[in-house]
Amino acid sequence: MKIYLSKINESWIVDRVRAEWYKYNPSISTEKIKEANIIWIIAPWVWKKTPKRHLKNKKVICSYYHFDFDKFGQKEKENFYNLDQYVDEYHVISEITKKQLSSLTDKKITSIPFWVNQNIWYEIENKEELRKSFDIDDEDYLVGSFQRDTEGHDLISPKLVKGPDIFIDLVKLIYAKNKKLKVILSGKRRNYVINQLEEAGIPYRYFEMVPLDVLNKLYNILNLYLVTSRVEGGPQAIFECALTKTPILSTRVGVAPEVLHKDSIYKVGEFSKAKIDIEYAFDSAQKYTIPNGFDDFLNMFNGVKIES
């Protein structure tokens, strides 16, 4: 069995997933699509870059991360079914997405969250010194958000599936009670949240695209990380918070039910009822660390019937 992973080159989480797969699973992987028995399409939005002759002649596993059915029009349906004709099995990273995908196809769907690299994401105990390195006071209450929040077409409109409006509402709620609050932002396209924070007079620090070791440090200085998405595939931030022991509260999206305690998952309008459970999240994430996090993927690929 030889597996080829489709390329994306978008400097996104999927690029890191692809690189880690090849690094830790070299004996069953190939960078040459001609040598592969299985093509793993990990970025379905660029599937057309894969030559159709290979899609026709090899087994195809396709990953999907989430569906925003509010934006799933005729064009999106046509693209899905154009790809579906070549797909043998599907992979999703959460049970929520599995339920969404099952409404579109009767093909086999396997739900396995992506692994998380504990060599990148880990707890740093000396928080005081860490904060000093960022020139942040120890008494500041830091709330983090490290995912894009703004639509790319105008760099103004909120990307509503990510819930940046919900994030702003919650930050305002916390700030009204605690003037020591500061927001820590990272990632691309944070325009909407930054504009809203400036309008509200809420202090923030923005670390745009920092190296992973710096991002790990940023997790470690937080008092709270907020996932406010309406629709989500992962996000990997849930795993990253779990391994760094960063306090996290999330809406019920993506892998949240698989990793977080049910009390750490909040409904919009009932945020005050949510409770942080760092140890529960940390313990839940252990099965997804490397190399354990590859096991279910290996089982999935071993179950694919390859014609000799």
Model-found features: residue ranges?
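Short hydrophobic beta-strand element within catalytic cores of glycosyltransferases
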Residues: 247-250
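Nucleotide-activated donor-binding/catalytic signature segment of Leloir-type glycosyltransferases, i.e.
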Residues: 187, 191-210, 216
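Conserved catalytic-core segment of nucleotide-activated headgroup transferases in glycan assembly
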Residues: 127, 132-133, 138-192
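N-terminal pre-catalytic "stem/leader" segment of glycosyltransferase-like enzymes
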Residues: 1-46
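A charged, aromatic-enriched C-terminal amphipathic alpha-helix characteristic of glycosyltransferases
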Residues: 272-308
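Donor nucleotide-sugar binding/catalytic pocket of nucleotide-sugar-dependent glycosyltransferases
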Residues: 88-100, 106-125, 142, 146-147
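Aromatic "clamp/platform" in nucleotide-sugar-dependent glycosyltransferases that forms part
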Residues: 230
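Short alpha-helical donor nucleotide-sugar binding micro-motif in glycosyltransferases
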Residues: 217-222
